[in-house]
């Protein structure tokens, strides 16, 4: 008879744990769905603007040299 009560206690513990986990997970999912259902104007304020990409322009080298590996190198004829 003891074995049945042990199994019942284990089953109740597992069910209680899963119920608490569902209570914690479901509200966050509902919040995400309700956030998606907002109009785009309301959500655009939450978005972080993307940084503009800076084009890396190599510096101008003096005549007779070329820009090689991030520095100006003199080309010997």
Curated annotation (Swiss-Prot):
The keyword Nucleotide-binding does not apply. It comes from the Eukaryota. Residues 33-52 form a propeptide. Residues 1-32 form the signal peptide. Coiled coil: none annotated. GO terms for cellular component: extracellular region. Keywords: Disulfide bond, Secreted, Signal. Nontoxic peptide. This is Secapin. It comes from Vespa magnifica (Hornet).
């Amino acid at each position: 008879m003891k074995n049945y009560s042990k199994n019942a206690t284990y089953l109740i513990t597992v069910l209680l744990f899963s119920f608490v986990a569902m209570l914690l997970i479901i509200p966050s999912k509902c919040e995400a769905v309700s956030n998606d259902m907002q109009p785009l104007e309301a959500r655009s304020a939450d978005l972080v603007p993307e940084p503009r990409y800076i084009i890396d322009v190599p510096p101008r080298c003096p005549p007779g040299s070329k820009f090689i590996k991030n520095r100006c190198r003199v080309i010997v004829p």
